Amino acid sequence: MVKILWVDDEVELLKPHVLFLQGKGYAVDTCNNGYDAIDMARATAYDLIILDEMMPGMTGLETLPLIKEQRPTTPVIMVTKSEEENIMDKAVGSKIADYIIKPVNPNQVLLSIK
């Protein structure tokens, strides 16, 4: 079973997406900040990490290299509300696999996973 970690400070809004992915056979863990994401990525070998770019405390862009330090081969999909290219250029430069712009469509997530 494919294991996914979804990191977003608006974790309550993810419930429908998590249920959708679980219905498709994915195991999905969630957390709401970069610090927990780093701990969870250290403890579990996820097949994919979906990471929100804008979070209070440690942003997605700050969290990304720390996760990549521990799990260099784990693909990361960045989720952003912003369509500013420079933000995604920074993320792409930090080796993200893909990015999604909010509001997130569950089918968009499914396509990115595949």
Task: Specify the residue positions occupied by each region the protein language model found.
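Receiver (REC) domain active-site loop signature in two-component systems and cognate sites
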Residues: M55
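C-terminal output helix
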Residues: N86, V104-I113
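Alpha4 helix (beta4-alpha4-beta5 surface) of REC/receiver domains from two-component response regulators
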Residues: E62, E83-D98
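Two-component/phosphorelay signaling modules centered on CheY-like receiver
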Residues: V11-D29
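Active-site beta3 strand of CheY-like receiver
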Residues: A45-I50
